[in-house]
Amino acid sequence: MLELVYEEIEEKMGKTLEVFKNDLKKVRTGRASLALLDGIVVDYYGTPTPLNQLASLSVPESRLIVIQPWDATAIKDVEKAILQANIDLTPSNDGKVIRLSIPPLTEDRRKEIAKRVNQMAEEHKVAMRNIRRDANETLKQMKKDGDISEDESFAGKDKVQKVTDGYIERIDEVFKAKEKEILEL
């Protein structure tokens, strides 16, 4: 019975950590990364199509992303989708390929981005704490229903707290690494 509670919080906290890592991939750091283009959907002949299914994406230099649509007629649609994606990059189009030049970030912009990443980390920590609260409520209800003893309830809450602390520590580690990446010139 308790194992189900532990498995559930491990699963939920693991997913929360993965979501945080995926969210961080979309944060600009001054270096070109194809992750910036994740989630961009192009209206291709009336069908919403992910950009990576319409074009060849590459990073030939550290500050340049090159997008080469397989269908040259879709280049305007791709350009429009990039502009609508609000990734703070302006595409330049030569008729065959689209180039996204990543400008170097100013010190103020770096600090602003680091602050935003910190907020994201805090939001995910709150999500972890909510998962912990739900697990503790479940344990309390199980004790009340007589499914577990008081000792098992305390031991369960202790284990839930340790798991929560571990995941919050992982979020902090991921955040620190991303912050370092953002702030380095």
From Swiss-Prot:
InterPro entries: Ribosome_recyc_fac, Ribosome_recyc_fac_dom, RRF_sf. GO terms for molecular function: ribosomal large subunit binding. Keywords: Cytoplasm, Protein biosynthesis. GO terms for cellular component: cytoplasm. It is found in: Cytoplasm. GO terms for biological process: translational termination. The keyword Protein biosynthesis applies. It holds the Pfam family RRF. HAMAP family: RRF. Responsible for the release of ribosomes from messenger RNA at the termination of protein biosynthesis. May increase the efficiency of translation by recycling ribosomes from one round of translation to another. Belongs to the RRF family. This is Ribosome-recycling factor. It comes from Desulfosudis oleivorans (strain DSM 6200 / JCM 39069 / Hxd3). The lineage of its organism: Bacteria, Pseudomonadati, Thermodesulfobacteriota, Desulfobacteria, Desulfobacterales.
